[in-house]
């Protein structure tokens, strides 16, 4: 469900992606699917700052967020977090861990706070080895231990079973030898520790050994993926495995999903054009996350100048992407760190110190109307007259009369004057969205549909009459 246009820069045909609209593959009124506006955002709370990270704590059954310089448990502040950049989170049966500013801090559920540090050098007549913990880049948890990535090295460390604020007493560090430039991120998959580098993704399994001289983790070469990630947040759990943005060191960046030890591309050519427009440093700052509601399985990629959304549930006939934005121009969507909380989907914010919650009865963001764009494919209409351009719309839910703006293109690049059509007003549930006299077409034609509204938008069944 996307249009076709031409690029004025290189004369290539490109996908005209829908903006703020999600495709739903469902039979409706002789159509194979329809497009529905992304839910709006209502304000929830004023908070300490911009959103830096989120995790659902399964032990406490509550969402932990880092907002500005504070850690929030639900809607209550429980601690201070240093720095201002993105953070990594993990949790155990006794603590919520936050890796920020190179330090791993454990916020225990009893109210105390600990940081990852070496055991005391001597306790009575017992001497403990002292290790170089380094700067913590990323953190995850597997079984009874936290795993942290030592920034700038090929090593990752594991905490002790007795006290998770200290490294393992006997064999705390392991090396991803296929990643000479250092591990960028870590995560878990089933019972494996996953180490993401710029050229490979390496898997480590537990050995189960109780011998203090034996390794806790051992590499599994059969699962290694010969692709790397672009940055620490450029991966997320998606489906049964992971999705990631590939590192430019392996060629032009793309988006891949890992399946059975291999990486399968899920990006289209138009998405890859957007990705390669960024420098390696800008691409490394991207953030990936997943979101699920109403049958949509979404993967959201937050880039510095774009927010891209992939819908796995609508991609059976090809990858279905759309663009998410805020306002009437090209500002990236302001919501980030979406999480199902209670019976609401809540989110942080990139631009203001607030949190929000999705409102499925609106498309407004914090009360402001949003722009929605759709494009039809270019179709042949050689020397023909076009009448009765019509869209099926679910109308009648607007508080004020909304207008839909239609404009045509004959070359796929330049769009003409917009035609305004009233498309939504209170209780007019059977209103037709109809442009009766479209005009004479010499060769090809395509249409852009633009709607600025705070009401939900549902469109399908585009059709015209040719003579």
Residue ranges and their predicted role:
Residues 39-50, 76-85, 117-145, 149-287:
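Beta-propeller and closely related beta-pinwheel folds
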Residues 89-125:
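Hydrophobic or amphipathic alpha-helical targeting/insertion segments
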Residues 69, 102-103, 152, 199, ...:
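Residue-level signature of beta-propeller blades and closely related beta-rich strand-turn architectures
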Residues 105-111, 154-167, 201, 308-315, ...:
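Short beta-strand segments and strand-loop junctions that repeat across beta-rich extracellular domains
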């Amino acid at each position: 469900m996307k249009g076709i246009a031409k690029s004025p820069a290189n004369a290539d045909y490109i996908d005209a992606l829908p903006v703020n609209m999600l495709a739903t593959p469902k039979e409706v009124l002789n159509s194979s699917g329809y497009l529905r506006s992304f839910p709006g955002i209502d304000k929830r709370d004023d908070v300490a700052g911009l959103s830096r990270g989120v995790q659902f704590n399964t032990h406490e059954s509550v969402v932990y967020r880092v907002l500005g310089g504070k850690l929030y448990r639900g809607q209550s502040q429980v601690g201070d977090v240093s720095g201002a950049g993105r953070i990594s989170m993990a949790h155990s049966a006794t603590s919520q861990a936050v890796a920020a500013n190179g330090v791993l801090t454990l916020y225990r559920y009893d109210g105390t706070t600990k940081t990852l540090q070496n055991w005391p050098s001597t306790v009575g007549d017992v001497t403990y080895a002292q290790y170089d913990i380094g700067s913590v880049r990323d953190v995850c948890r597997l079984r009874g231990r936290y795993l942290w990535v030592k920034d700038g090295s090929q090593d990752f460390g594991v905490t002790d079973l007795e006290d998770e604020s200290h490294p393992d007493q006997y064999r705390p560090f392991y090396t991803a030898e296929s990643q000479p430039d250092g591990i960028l991120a870590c995560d878990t998959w089933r019972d494996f520790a996953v180490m993401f580098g710029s050229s490979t993704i390496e898997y480590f399994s537990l050995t189960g050994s109780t011998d203090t001289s034996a390794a806790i983790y051992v590499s599994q070469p059969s699962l290694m993926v010969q692709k790397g990630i672009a940055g620490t947040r450029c991966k997320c759990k998606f489906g049964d495995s992971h999705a990631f943005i590939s590192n430019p060191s392996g060629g032009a960046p793309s988006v891949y999903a890992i399946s059975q030890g291999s990486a399968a591309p899920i990006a289209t050519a138009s998405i890859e054009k957007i990705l390669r427009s960024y420098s390696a440093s800008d691409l490394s700052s991207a953030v990936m996350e997943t979101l699920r509601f109403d049958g949509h399985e979404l993967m959201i990629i937050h880039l510095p100048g774009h927010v891209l959304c992939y819908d796995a549930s609508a991609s059976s006939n090809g990858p279905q992407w759309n663009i998410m934005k805020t306002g009437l121009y090209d500002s990236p969507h302001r919501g980030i760190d979406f999480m199902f909380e209670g019976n609401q989907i809540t989110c942080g914010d990139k631009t203001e110190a607030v949190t929000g919650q999705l409102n499925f009865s609106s498309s407004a963001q914090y009360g402001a109307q949003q722009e929605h764009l759709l494009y039809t494919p270019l179709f042949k209409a050689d020397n023909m007259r076009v009448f009765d351009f019509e869209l099926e719309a679910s109308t009648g839910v607007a508080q004020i009369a909304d207008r839909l703006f239609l404009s045509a293109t004959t070359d796929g690049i330049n769009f003409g004057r917009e035609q305004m059509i009233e498309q939504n007003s209170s209780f007019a549930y059977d209103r037709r969205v109809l442009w009766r006299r479209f005009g004479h077409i010499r060769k090809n034609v395509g249409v852009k549909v633009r709607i600025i509204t705070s009401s939900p938008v549902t469109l399908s069944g585009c059709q015209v009459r040719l003579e």
